Structures are given as structure tokens and as C-alpha cells.
Amino acid sequence: MSSINTNPSAMTALQALAATNRNLAVVQQRISTGFRVGEAKDNAAYWSIATTMRSDNKILSTVQDSLGLGASRIDTAYTSMENALTLVDEIKQKVLAAIGMSEDNKEKIQAEISAYQSQLRSTARTANFSGVNWLYVDGLSQDKIISAFTRDQTGAILLGSIDIDVDAIKLYDEAATTNTTMGILEGLRLGTTGERNNSATDPTPGTVAATDGYAVDTLDVVGFSDDQIRQMLTVVDITLAEMTEAATAIGAIKRRIDIQKEYTSKLMDSIDRGVGQLVDADMNRESTRLQALQVQQQLGIQSLSIANSNAQNILLLFQG
């Protein structure tokens, strides 16, 4: 039935065109932003998950920065420790050369040893990066580098860290008061064993005692007997071994940091891919849909135009 008051065909065509325009707007939005889910209204669950994952990735980026800073500190400590090892080895050669020497020659040798001792302190003092020094400390015994971030099943944040046993690698400790808590180079070591011992005491030149203690930092060959100098040599040997262990520990930490940095980088990439799977638009698909919807839009306009012409056709009937 034809009517001049109601045009069902035009209404149907208008509804179809409106639906096409809405779909076209959605596709154009996806193409312009690159997101299939750009707002919570698009898909609340996916948007929430993606937002949380993006936030986690920002935290992981901060963790990556922390690892980079830690790596720089470790590099600084390792470089300084290597230099210190070279200096202590030089001291060892000088102590060995002092055996059997006259006091005049011992004084000359001691002048060189003292220069190395001063350089050792300077090396340890300058092992500083961003205000942190693990070789020359003032009471610091432990430190840590933030190395990991995750969430548990309840959503609570969990942080992981790489612990630094500063006590095991420090060369000097200004706050230490006993031989066993002092740094590797300054704590007195028993001349008989080379081990740091709280019962060790300063030796008397020329007289060997069971409690004689020596430290690389304060070593002095002038006035001491050959037997005492041999004990000094034992102390320097054990000190070198301890420093080598410390350098090995530093190197192991550096390797852990490098591994964790690589893992964190891969984890961030994985999260980015996961977010993309949830919210990114498939541009090939959207491009195809855009073309189809544009055709539908043109057809809808033509259909609406034809439907609107029905009233004109009714008028022509009366004109006949």
C-alpha cells in the first residue's frame, strides 16, 4: 500500500544507511588509530588487560634502567679491582726483593711500596659510580640491584633483586673496628697463615711473635727481619687470592645482570606483542571492510533516493 504519510521503504533505507555509516565510522577510527580496542567501550575486558600490561611494561622499562645503572656500577668496581690486583702484585714483587737486603735498600724499596699503597687507596676511592662505591665503604655491608618485576595471582607487585655482598669485595671500610670486618687490604692478617684474625697485633721490628699481623695497606719492610718479611709475603699472597675471589664474584654479578637485561628486553617485547594481539587492528582486514562499507554507503544513498521518489510517483497519478 502506498501512503503519503508513511514511507516504509524510505525508513528501511534510512536505517540501513545509518547502520552502514556507524560501521564506517568504526572502521575509519580503527584505521586512523591502529587500534581495534582503543577505549573501554570497545571491549572493557581487553582494554583493562591491555592497560595493565602497558603499565607493567613501563615498570619493566624502569627495571631495565636499574639494571643498566647496576651494570655501570659493577663495571666500575671490576675495573678498579683489576687495577688494585696489579698494584698488590707489584707490592708482592717489592716485598720479595726486600729479603736479604740492607736497611738502606729496604728504605728505597719501602718508598716504592708506600707509593703503591697510596695508589691503592686512590683506586678504591675512585671506584664510584653515581654515588655508589663498593670497594671503599663506610659501614655498607650489603646492597642490591632491582632486577625483576612481576605480579602474583592477586595482582600484587613483586620485585626481584640481585644482592651484592659488599663485605666480600670491599677493600677498605672506614667504619670497621676489627680486623675481620675491615676491608681486604686493611685488616691485620696473621703472618703464619695470612688470614685476617682479631687476635693479630702490630709486629715489633726484628722480633717474630705468634700474633704478628700484617696488612697490605700498612706493610713496611724497614727494620723487619727476613723471617718477618717472609710472613709479609704470605700475607700478600693470601690477600691476592682473596682479591681474585672478589673480582670473580664481581664478574659473576656482571654476567647475571647481562642475562637479566636480555631477558627483560625479551619480556617487554613479548608483552608488547600480547597487547597487540588484544587491541591492535588488522589493517588488511579493516582496509577491505572500508572499501566494502563505502560501496554499501553509496548503494544506501541510492536506495534512499529511490524510496523518497515514491511520493513523487503518487503525485504523478493525480496529475494524469
Q: Where would I find each of the regions flagged by the language model?
A:
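Amphipathic alpha-helical coiled-coil/heptad-repeat segments
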Residues: 1-10, 36-43, 47-269, 273-280, ...
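Short loop/turn microsegments at loop-to-beta-strand junctions
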Residues: 130, 290-291
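Alpha-helical coiled-coil
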Residues: 2-19, 23, 292
